[in-house]
Amino acid sequence: MNFNLLNKVIAGIVFLISFIVLFMTVQPSVSFWDCGEFVAASVSLQVPHPPGTPFFLLLGNIFSKLPIGENLGYRVNMISVISSAISILLLYLIAVKLIENYKGKKADNMFDAIATYVSAAIGALAFSFSDTFWFNGVEAEVY
């Protein structure tokens, strides 16, 4: 039996849960440390400090022009929210592949499919709500 649709549905749910929680807790403005520097450098397309993080700055410049939020800090912070939610989605998909490789086969019955997909979802969401990931997923910071 093929459980690809179930895998895709659970992957979408994992993405939505992490995105919604990060979106609801995103910094409304510039936060501490380098965030203000990254926001200012994104708006003006300048190098914040070497090596410069050019891709983040280009995305920050694009997001700073979007008509969302009240200020530039919020707009640039949304890059971290979106990229963090995508990271959790990819972590879920990688965990599914690792579990399937460990077992030596894809799920062939409903119990194996649910065990594989739910355990990968729990692992991905546990990482999503860990302190360090969550803290850096809601502010304009590059690591």
Model-derived regions, located:
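Transmembrane-helix motifs of polytopic, lipid-linked glycan transferases
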Residues: G12, M78-D108
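Aromatic- and kink-enriched transmembrane "portal" helix at the membrane-lumen/periplasm boundary
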Residues: G69-N77, K105-T116, G123-Y143
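Transmembrane signal-anchor helices characteristic of membrane glycosylation enzymes that use polyprenol
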Residues: N4-F32, F127-F129
